[in-house]
């Protein structure tokens, strides 16, 4: 049994953003949720998030999670922020885990190691890491496992700044925590109450303070846009490695972007520059071409999305293909063996088995029957300026190039629409519809006009 407190009240001025720092996205998900999910993995008895700057937005992001919220009205430092949780946890005996909302790389295993030290008798345990460049972090003074002190960088003399072992911002405490917090003073350059000052307070009360050396990567926090990009790179590298370990082929993996919510099956091939977002799900043997973008899109086994195609909220069934340079908008459903080619846009439309739309077409609010061919330049004119209307095309029909089908309209099974037609009435099954002016040839006119006759 333990309680976990996540500190998420900081303003994040160096981000230069109106968005609270902990809500900046990492791989499509707010930074804070990484810290929250690591905390939940250890099944805490109580989970408190301390919010402050932009707190209303932060609380909104926490909706649906089993958390309690404490407020820090004034930004007076990390110790002051943690003290705001006392009202919720006053009767909780401990131990307590404390982490930061802007440190998203911490693993449950590392947090468990901190907690274990307190359960084994330490009063306080803090996570440390050795960084090649420790700029911006508090430095650790220690003797063996025992921590002698923790000095904030802004208050550190040069010889202490030279130390590369830093405070990674994660702690475990025994039940003495809130009593100790009330002894923290703000006698420092920033006039703030620092959480690391608890090291000296715990030691003064005869309680052991231990360091747990962690992986340097996990200590990375986010205070600037550059650090945000660095942390996102770490998360991406981990995610790519995980999927390649499960049988996904990535060609030039360092160029591929994907989010944790994406699901991939074995033998999927991702070409350079592929972007996979949201609830995208890709089945076995599928291929995603160079610089294709898929968001909330499903590819059933064997489907292909070719280069530079953008798909949002689409569903491709086995053997279907789209691209290159196709656009599939929400509600686009391509059944088995459908092919949508270059510069074809499909929106809120069902294309039945074997439909071909090779190039330069727009299919919106349409249903196209099995085996039908859509010629180049075909448009379903679905919008009359006020409402959207449906176009229905039957099985094995042929829609000639550069035709416009003005909805609402139906073209029957095995019907033909002549090239260049504007269809405003239903076309019966098996009929030929031609809606254009009859061609006239004026003999000799061109030669006379050009003066060569």
Swiss-Prot record:
Keywords: Acyltransferase, Cell shape, Cell wall biogenesis/degradation, Cytoplasm, Magnesium, Metal-binding, Multifunctional enzyme, Nucleotidyltransferase, Peptidoglycan synthesis, Repeat, Transferase. It is found in: Cytoplasm. One of its GO terms (biological process) is cell morphogenesis. The active site is at residue 359. Binds 1 Mg(2+) ion per subunit. Disulfide bonds: none annotated. GO terms for molecular function: glucosamine-1-phosphate N-acetyltransferase activity; magnesium ion binding; UDP-N-acetylglucosamine diphosphorylase activity. Coiled coil: none annotated. Pathway: Nucleotide-sugar biosynthesis; UDP-N-acetyl-alpha-D-glucosamine biosynthesis; N-acetyl-alpha-D-glucosamine 1-phosphate from alpha-D-glucosamine 6-phosphate (route II): step 2/2; Nucleotide-sugar biosynthesis; UDP-N-acetyl-alpha-D-glucosamine biosynthesis; UDP-N-acetyl-alpha-D-glucosamine from N-acetyl-alpha-D-glucosamine 1-phosphate: step 1/1; Bacterial outer membrane biogenesis; LPS lipid A biosynthesis. It comes from the Bacteria. It catalyses: alpha-D-glucosamine 1-phosphate + acetyl-CoA = N-acetyl-alpha-D-glucosamine 1-phosphate + CoA + H(+); N-acetyl-alpha-D-glucosamine 1-phosphate + UTP + H(+) = UDP-N-acetyl-alpha-D-glucosamine + diphosphate. Mg(2+) binds at residues 102, 223. Residues 226-246 are annotated as: Linker. Homotrimer. This is Bifunctional protein GlmU. It comes from Thermus thermophilus (strain ATCC BAA-163 / DSM 7039 / HB27). The lineage of its organism: Bacteria, Thermotogati, Deinococcota, Deinococci, Thermales. The gene is glmU.
């Amino acid at each position: 049994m333990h309680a976990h407190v996540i500190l998420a009240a900081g303003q994040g001025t160096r981000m230069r953003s109106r968005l609270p720092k902990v809500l900046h996205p990492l791989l499509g998900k707010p930074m804070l949720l990484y810290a929250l999910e690591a905390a939940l993995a250890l099944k805490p008895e109580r989970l408190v998030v301390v919010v402050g700057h932009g707190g209303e937005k932060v609380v909104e992001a926490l909706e649906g999670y089993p958390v309690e919220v404490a407020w820090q009205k004034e930004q007076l430092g990390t110790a002051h922020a943690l003290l705001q949780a006392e009202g919720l946890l006053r009767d909780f005996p401990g131990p307590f885990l404390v982490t930061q909302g802007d440190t998203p790389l911490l693993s449950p295993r590392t947090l468990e190691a901190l907690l274990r030290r307190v359960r084994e008798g330490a009063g306080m345990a803090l996570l440390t890491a050795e960084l090649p460049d420790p700029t911006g972090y508090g430095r650790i003074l220690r003797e063996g496992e025992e921590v002698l002190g923790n000095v904030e960088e802004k208050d550190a003399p040069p010889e202490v700044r030279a130390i590369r072992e830093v405070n990674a911002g994660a702690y475990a405490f025994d039940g003495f925590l809130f009593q100790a917090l009330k002894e923290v003073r703000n006698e420092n350059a920033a006039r703030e109450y620092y959480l690391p000052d608890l090291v000296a307070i715990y030691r003064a009360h005869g309680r052991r303070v231990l360091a747990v050396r962690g992986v340097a990567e996990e200590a990375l926090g986010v205070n600037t846009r550059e650090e945000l990009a660095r942390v996102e790179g770490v998360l991406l590298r981990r995610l790519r490695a995980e999927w390649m370990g499960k049988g996904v082929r990535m060609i030039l993996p360092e160029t591929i972007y994907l989010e944790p919510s994406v699901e991939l099956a074995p033998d999927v091939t991702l070409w350079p520059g592929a972007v996979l977002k949201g609830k995208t799900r890709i089945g076995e043997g599928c291929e995603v071409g160079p610089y294709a973008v898929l968001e909330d899109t499903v590819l059933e086994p064997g489907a292909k999305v070719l280069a530079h195609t953008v798909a949002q909220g689409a569903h491709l069934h086995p053997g279907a293909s789209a691209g290159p340079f196709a656009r599939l908008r929400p509600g686009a459903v391509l059944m088995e063996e459908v092919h949508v080619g270059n510069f074809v846009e499909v929106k809120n439309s069902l294309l039945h088995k074997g439909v071909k739309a090779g190039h330069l077409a727009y299919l919106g609010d349409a249903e196209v029957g099995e085996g039908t061919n859509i010629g180049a330049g075909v448009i379903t004119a679905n919008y009359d300026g006020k409402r959207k209307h449906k176009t229905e095309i039957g099985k094995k029909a042929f829609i000639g190039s550069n035709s416009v089908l003005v909805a609402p309209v139906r073209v029957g099974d095995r019907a033909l629409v002549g090239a260049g037609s504007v269809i405003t009435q239903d076309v019966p099954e098996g009929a030929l519809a031609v809606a254009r002016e009859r061609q006239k040839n004026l003999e000799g006119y061109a030669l006379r006009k050009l003066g060569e006759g």
